[in-house]
Regions:
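Single conserved hydrophobic/aromatic residue that forms the stacking wall/gate
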Residues: 306-318
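Redox- and metal-dependent alpha/beta enzyme cores, enriched for Fe-S-associated oxidoreductases
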Residues: 242, 246-274, 287-294
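Glycine-rich beta-alpha junction loops
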Residues: 93-94, 150-157, 256-258
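Conserved thiamine diphosphate
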Residues: 102-152, 176
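Thiamine diphosphate
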Residues: 1-111, 116, 133, 153
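A general structural motif
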Residues: 99-102, 221-237, 254-262, 281-289
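Conformationally flexible catalytic loops at phosphate/diphosphate-handling active centers
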Residues: 31-35, 146-241
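Short, solvent-exposed amphipathic alpha-helical segments in soluble enzyme
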Residues: 20-22, 77-79, 136-138, 163-166, ...
Length: 318
């Protein structure tokens, strides 16, 4: 990240606060520069700043949740449509309706499913540390913005000892050629280009459909960087990870912090001889049916979805 456009909203505020502190202290990023932090008047302003900053070739990030994320949706459509790589870090939180609720669920990120952002989910603080670089690297190589999310409070405020990335490892994993290509694509008076122009129906649809090839290729790009993480850390991250009995007949599909709890329940049940398992969803958008079919046990008779039932059920059925 070279620029962070921020506006505080619970429970995402500590992320922006840490970046602001690190910037003020002169802490460098992997490119050897200090992150420029810009606090705006609202989340809508922060999203607009992200869009503009990306347009001039700066690697840009923001942090938000709930109604704050909803205010960013208009710019998210533009960012995705222009294939500008960035990462929105979201501590997923309930969207307030009849009453305010600051606790975690996925109603805010589900509202962004149609924006064109890829969506990557983590279970616990260690996974956030391990997989956030995957979002950044895949965004650059895949030319697609990412919404990197985890459960508000349950994960965002969890106190846990973690293994941290070394900056040299991060630099080694970063696709520098993609970074240079992104910067070369920036708005520049020396090689002017038109952005956000008007198109009539004769070409608008064709241009909109042309991006499908990018999304079709993206799961393989994400998997590539997950494998790089696995090589460095000895982990086994995948687009979907299976946990449980190899001959499970009942399988739960879940996403987010609930996975750690489900794993403990599966350990208890399999010790008693029950054939149960868990599929952990990591890459939620674009959904890879091919990848999830590889991890569903051939013996499975029942699939149950926890916490992600309606939106993910549509994906699973398709």
């Amino acid at each position: 990240t070279e620029v962070a456009a921020i506006y505080p909203i619970t429970p995402s505020s500590p992320m922006a606060d840490y970046v602001d502190q690190w910037s003020a202290a002169g802490r460098k990023n992997i490119f050897g520069s200090t992150v420029k932090v810009v606090e705006m008047e609202s989340e809508a302003g922060a999203a607009g700043t992200v869009h503009g900053s990306l347009g001039v070739g700066a690697l840009t990030t923001t942090f938000t949740a709930s109604q704050g994320l909803l205010l960013m949706i208009p710019n998210m459509y533009k960012i995705a449509g222009e294939q500008l790589p960035c990462v929105f870090d979201v501590s997923a939180r309930t969207v307030s309706s009849h009453a305010l609720n600051i606790f975690g669920d996925h109603s805010d990120v589900y509202a962004c499913r149609q924006t064109g952002f890829a969506m990557l989910c983590e279970t616990n603080p260690q996974e956030v540390m391990d997989l956030s670089p995957v979002a950044h690297c895949a965004a650059l190589e895949g030319k697609t913005p990412f919404l990197n999310f985890f459960d508000g409070f349950r994960t965002s405020h969890e106190i846990q000892k973690i293994e941290e990335w070394d900056y040299e490892d991060l630099k080694d994993m970063c696709p520098m050629d993609a970074v240079e290509e992104f910067r070369a694509h920036a708005l520049n008076p020396n090689h002017p280009s038109a952005r956000g122009s008007h198109e009539n129906g004769d070409i608008f649809f064709q241009h909109r459909e042309a991006c499908n090839s990018v999304y079709d290729a993206l799961p393989a790009v994400v998997e590539k960087y997950m494998n790089k993480v696995n090589e460095k850390l000895g982990t086994n991250y995948g687009l979907f990870n299976y946990y449980g009995a190899p001959d499970a007949e009942r399988v739960i599909i879940a996403m987010g912090s609930v996975n750690d709890v489900v794993e403990e329940v599966i350990d208890y049940l399999t010790a008693k001889g029950e054939k149960v398992g868990l599929i952990k969803v990591r890459l939620y958008r674009p959904w890879s049916s091919e990848a999830i079919l590889k991890v569903i046990p051939k013996t499975a008779k029942k699939l149950s979805l926890i916490h992600i039932s309606e939106p993910t059920r549509l994906q699973l059925i398709s």
